[in-house]
Amino acid sequence: FFNVEAWINSELATEFAEQEEIAFTTGDGTKKPKGSLAYESTDETDKVRAFGKLQHIVSGDATAVTADAIIKLIYTLRKAHRTGAKFMMNNNSLFAIRLLKDSEGNYLWLPGLELGQPSSLAGYGIAENEQMPDIAADAKAIAFGNFKRGYTIVDRIGTRILRDPYTNKPFVGFYTTKRTGGMLVDSQAIKLLKIAVA
């Protein structure tokens, strides 16, 4: 016996998670949430930057991220926001970051050595998000911040599934809806690392 509805629920959960990741990262705000990377960014500091604009730090290299840029990104974020802060980047960027060393030859990336402990970069957790751009000239490849304070996600409870055995006989159709939203609520809580142009 194969439970079609359970399988559909599982597939829907996966698809909704992927679509939400896209929307919350790069969504343009038209019939979808405005993603964190869709907000304008500037190199202005928190003291002079207008609300709704994110601050970016420009890396010193057009093809790579340096250890100095990572440290600068961390300390551009105010102390109050560093509590609970994480890095966000895609898998390709994470691979490049894992090779970074400090001036004494120590890796900035540390594996989680205990069961259940996550890996860290310079003491902060890492969230993988495949919607973040690769490290390339002018890309905002890495975000660092307290995303819970900086970006709010609102979900209407539950996913609505309508089972329709009548419209397309002998087939059964499934119609699914889910309502969600997201927006930047504290532009000082998230910083971006923008790769240099040249």
Which residues fall in each region the model found?
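Structured, hydrophobic secondary-structure cores that serve as assembly/anchoring elements
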Residues: 1-198
